[in-house]
Every structure is written in C-alpha cells, then in structure tokens.
Amino acid sequence: MADLITVEDPEDPRLRDYTGLTDVELRRKREPAEGLFIAEGEKVIRRAKEAGYEMRSMLLSAKWIDVMRDVIDELPAPVYAVSPEVAEQVTGYHVHRGALASMQRKPLPTANELLRSARRVVVMESVNDHTNIGAIFRSAAALGMDAVLLSPDCADPLYRRSVKVSMGAVFSVPYARLETWPKGLESVREAGFTLLALTPDDKARSFDEAAPHKMDRVALMLGAEGDGLSTQALVAADEWVRIPMSHGVDSLNVGAAAAVAFYAVTTGRPES
C-alpha cells in the first residue's frame, strides 16, 4: 500500500516531477531525459497502469483519494495529497481532473521490431502538435492500426497533452522512431510494406481506387498540419492516396483525415 502524504508547500522537492507542466519547452526536454511522463485523470492513469507502466508517484486533491483508492492500495509509490490551490501552484494550471501520476517510461522498440508482426502501420512526418499526435493515436487504436512510426522531429506521444487527448490510447498502440528521414522509409519498404502517402494532390488516387484494405502490408504516411508531407517523403512513397472531398472543401485537419484514412486502410468502403 502506498504512503499517503499530505503536502502543503508547493516548493516541496518531492513534487518536482509535477512542476511547470505548462512549460512546453522545459517538459519536452526534461521528461524524456529523466525517463518520466505525466498521466492526467482517472481513466488515463488506470490505462497507463494496465499497460504496465511503473508509477513513480501520484498527486491528488482530497476528493480524488476515494475514487483512486484501489489504485493507491496497490501502489508501492508515494501518493501526495494536496489542495487544489497547491496543485495549481505546482503545475501551473488548474488541475480540474484532480489526479496526476508520474510514470516511468519504457524503452522504445526499434522500428524493425515493430514491423515484424504488423500489417497496418502509421508513419508520421513532422507532426509536432501534441493535440494532433494524441488524436491520431486515439484513431489508430480505435480503427485497428498495428503500430506507429515517427520521424525524428515528431512530437512526443507521452507528453501530457498527447496522452490526455488520446485518452490513454498511446499506451495501446506500440510506436518507434525512425532514426533517419526519409532514408528510414527504406527499411519499412524492405519489410514488405507498400508506402502510401496521404495527400490532397489531384494526382493521387482515391482510397476506393487504391483499395489499400486489400493490400498485404500497408504503411500510411501522414504529414504535419498545413504543410502536409514533404517533397522528399512524397518521392519516397510507392503511391499517393487522397480522401475525396465535397462542397468545395480541399482538405481536413490531420487528425480527422487520419481517422478516415485508417478506416479505409483497415476496412475499406462497406459494400452497398
């Protein structure tokens, strides 16, 4: 059973894992370096625990202690009980979900390790918005994608905002970082995958025409919001695919486009 420790001083060094959570640049560098990430909210904390992540500590306001009692009773890690005011001073924002947990990161698998057993893979290039990362992981989990590969400059899937938006789906879909870009795509092709680049370009085939759900192994490439895939990535692809649009709309945001594309890749259009 975890020790339940009441903390009244926001400067208490035991709360260091939770300081400055709104400082994106600080947390982006600090969390991977220290091997930690922050899970926020009851559902996300439970999903991280179920996925086998080790908990370093928890930070709770009083009303959440009973809600999380079963988790607390199983933990060897300390649980810090604080007032909402202290929580806000420590983290830099109003913790309206009332529960935070500092989790230990796991070593990432290599891309080749993930590709051995996968058939439907997401490949992201330069997606550096944490909200988009979280949304894409949530859709990938819901729609049956097997794994995610990230270019070296993609945002951290375990950053607090990414985890929160994904509702913990980042714990369900394994991911790895390609060491080089776009050269790293060669290893994906060598593993037997067809590289499909998602683009609104008129030269791309529609998903109905390409029928990726009938292909043996597919790696669907997604670019950043606004810019899309780079020229180098498009050149490296085996084929370009697009989502047909109506009513003068020329594109969707990357999160919405990803969900549509994942359905096309895993299932295809239902037969009428």
Language-model segments: residues:
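Short acidic-hydrophobic, aromatic-tinged amphipathic segments that line or gate anion-handling sites
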Residues: 4-11, 78-83, 174-183
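Structured adenosyl-cofactor binding patch, chiefly the S-adenosyl-L-methionine
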Residues: 99-101, 139-143, 157-170, 231-272
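Boundary-proximal intrinsically disordered activation/regulatory segments immediately upstream
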Residues: 1-66, 154-155
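Active-site/ligand-binding-proximal alpha/beta "capping" segment
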Residues: 196-249
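RNA substrate-binding interface of SAM-dependent RNA methyltransferases
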Residues: 43, 50, 107-108, 113-203
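Glycine/small-residue-rich loop that forms an oxyanion/phosphate-binding "nest" at active or ligand-binding sites
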Residues: 68, 73-96
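Glycine- and other small-residue-rich loops at beta-strand/loop junctions that grip anionic moieties
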Residues: 7, 37, 125-126, 151-152, ...
